[in-house]
Amino acid sequence: MSASDLTSVQAGAPQGRRQILVTSALPYANGQIHIGHLVEYIQTDIWVRTMRMHGHEIYYIGADDTHGTPVMLRAEQEGVSPKQLIERVWREHKRDFDSFGVSFDNFYTTDSDENRVLSETIYLALKEAGFIAEREIEQAYDPVRQMFLPDRFIKGECPKCHAKDQYGDSCEVCGTTYQPTDLIHPYSVVSGAAPVRKTSTHYFFRLSDPRCEAFLREWVSGLAQPEATNKMREWLGEAGEAKLADWDISRDAPYFGFEIPGAPGKYFYVWLDAPVGYYASFKNLCQRRGLDFDAWIRKDSTTEQYHFIGKDILYFHTLFWPAMLEFSGHRTPTNVFAHGFLTVDGAKMSKSRGTFITAQSYIDTGLNPEWLRYYFAAKLNATMEDIDLNLEDFQARVNSDLVGKYVNIASRAAGFLLKRFDGRVQASAMNHPLLATLRGAIPQIAAHYEAREYGRALRQTMELADAVNGYVDSAKPWELAKDPANAVALHETCSVSLEAFRLLSLALKPVLPRVAQGVEAFLGIAPLTWADAGMPLSPEQPVRAYQHLMTRVDPKQIDALLAANRGSLQGTAAAAEAGAANGNGAGSKNGKGAKAAAQPAASAANADDGASPIISIDDFAKIDLRIAKIVACQAVEGSDKLLQLTLDVGEERTRNVFSGIKSAYRPEQLVGKLTVMVANLAPRKMKFGLSEGMVLAASAADEKAEPGLYILEPHSGAKPGMRVK
């Protein structure tokens, strides 16, 4: 389908029953779903529901993106296998999507037999067609863990601004991009060791092949978003520039993923098998439902295929993915729809401010998921513009639009209709001019949704709601009800109000599916579709007792949501204070009397069995406790107890501390963690070097009976150099 065809379809009524495959980007299986993710899934779900309401054959496909080094290392950190980790995360992600009404036809995993077979098939087809190259490359290598390191697993000092602890590809302080080899004093995030350079054979997809450039120049002309088209043309350059570079599609063992056929110890890079995971998830669905999978993906398929993504992964979905499909003999995407980023209260999501909001915390705090669906929809359009969740505006808009304008229409009319007219509408009222206006607007609202102009659809819907409320205010049914002589007028007013409410509910159904279900049950009607705009309520079907469909947002709920997501040192201090009052130290792990104990430079101090002497607040104030970030860690040669920690305490230089916690932690487990240190302890010279402080850890009073050491780890949001007080 060309861009002009797509525009014509989006501008008007559906042209016959279409077959459509839709995907959202796959969430990575090493973290929680947050509201930034939900922008995309809600956007996609609204579009899918819109098309279902037209009666099209449409399948919404998703999966967890499960492969790669981060998943492998996260699993190791948690003491589980990668498969155990991704199975747990899949359940968490599925729970969150269900909570927000994201209606996948199949939510699967990229770690599946279907994905392995499809990835191998596509790779071998590309190899047969001459699109796979093999060459030696030099990479950073961790000599301790014996593994090659991705750029983001190398840190060091920025070569430009000299900021510490920066990633191997760019500086978060000054914004400079560079090669990992440019870092000053680089170290492996995995082990803390200095990386070395090592060569390895890698496999490349030859995106630089002239056939790829020719195909992509033609394919880009069909993209619906001008911003995407312009960005792709920038990447492609002018004819003859040859700006496209070959794409490394392989990684070396150890790696969690699929091994490349005929290349032992080499694995597909996650970005090769992740988009193939769209097809794998769909194939799994086809096998269960008896659908013809090949008819949807073969080169001459007449089906449609749309990908909803964030603008940060446009490169993969508009260059690599369509080229992979084209030259492996498959159909290419009909279109790719990219959205912008989410900010909260005008700023990036922040753990310290509590605005890095997880989906589960939103649900646990008792907020209605359809509030957020409505607010995001009101902000979304067909462009790649960023959107902002302003929490004050969120509260005001939901309370005004959904409660004040929309659901109140039903609550104002239902009681009179049930009490006076047995819940049956007046047949003649269904021809009221106001209702004709609403019915006439439904096709345009549906077209706005299909064009991804959700904000326009909702603005038009709320303008209609204003008109309905104006009608009710003018008719004054509460006044009409006082005089039996006004029964006909009262019946008409309530009937017009409820039919208008049905039409508004139809207009809002893609955004508020659960409210729509409640409306359908209340009115005693079948599930609403766009074709039902002209099918008014019937006097033959009485409405049922009205149940509240939506409550107002309480400001206290917003406060509770922020508190639930805020990484706060006050919370840590309060817990320590409460623990002390109960006879337990701040580092209490299990409530069995474990105490916080400082770990001196040489070895872990044994906690005193008895209570410590009482000290004054002045004595305590002498201790300068600071948040420290462990930027490097290594075992001390010749010692079976000590680890050498390099700590960032917010000063111009790092500090060196020896700590007797080797029995409890491997060096790679500690790198990147925050902890608490005594910053004003006099330096101590040891045979291994100078120790410039001590870190804090907890241990049981009787370490022989209950062994274990536990370093103190502040909540997210704490920063190196912050005082603990």
Swiss-Prot record:
Binding-site positions, ATP: 351
Cofactor binding note of this UniProt entry: Binds 1 zinc ion per subunit.
SUPFAM superfamilies linked: Anticodon-binding domain of a subclass of class I aminoacyl-tRNA synthetases (SSF47323), Methionyl-tRNA synthetase (MetRS), Zn-domain (SSF57770), Nucleic acid-binding proteins (SSF50249), Nucleotidylyl transferase (SSF52374)
One MF term in the entry's GO annotations: tRNA binding
Binding site for Zn(2+): 158, 161, 171, 174
Cofactor(s) listed in the protein's UniProt record: Zn(2+)
Motif 'HIGH' region boundaries: 27-37
InterPro entries (UniProt xref): aa-tRNA-synth_I_CS, Anticodon_Met, Met-tRNA-synth_bsu_C, Met-tRNA_ligase_1, Met-tRNA_synth, Methionyl/Leucyl_tRNA_Synth, MetRS_core, MetRS_Zn
UniProt main location, coarse: cytoplasm
EC number: 6.1.1.10
Localisation per UniProt entry: Cytoplasm
Catalysis: reaction(s): tRNA(Met) + L-methionine + ATP = L-methionyl-tRNA(Met) + AMP + diphosphate
Top enzyme category: ligase
PROSITE patterns: AA_TRNA_LIGASE_I, TRBD
Gene Ontology CC, one term: cytosol
Stored CDD domains: Anticodon_Ia_Met, MetRS_core, tRNA_bind_EcMetRS_like
Stored Gene3D superfamilies: HUPs (3.40.50.620), Isoleucyl-tRNA Synthetase, Domain 1 (1.10.730.10), Methionyl-tRNA synthetase, Zn-domain (2.20.28.20), Nucleic acid-binding proteins (2.40.50.140)
Record keyword Ubl conjugation present: no
Similarity-based family: Belongs to the class-I aminoacyl-tRNA synthetase family. MetG type 1 subfamily.
Subunit-level organization: Homodimer.
Function: Is required not only for elongation of protein synthesis but also for the initiation of all mRNA translation through initiator tRNA(fMet) aminoacylation.
Name used for this protein in its record: Methionine--tRNA ligase
Source organism: Burkholderia pseudomallei (strain K96243)
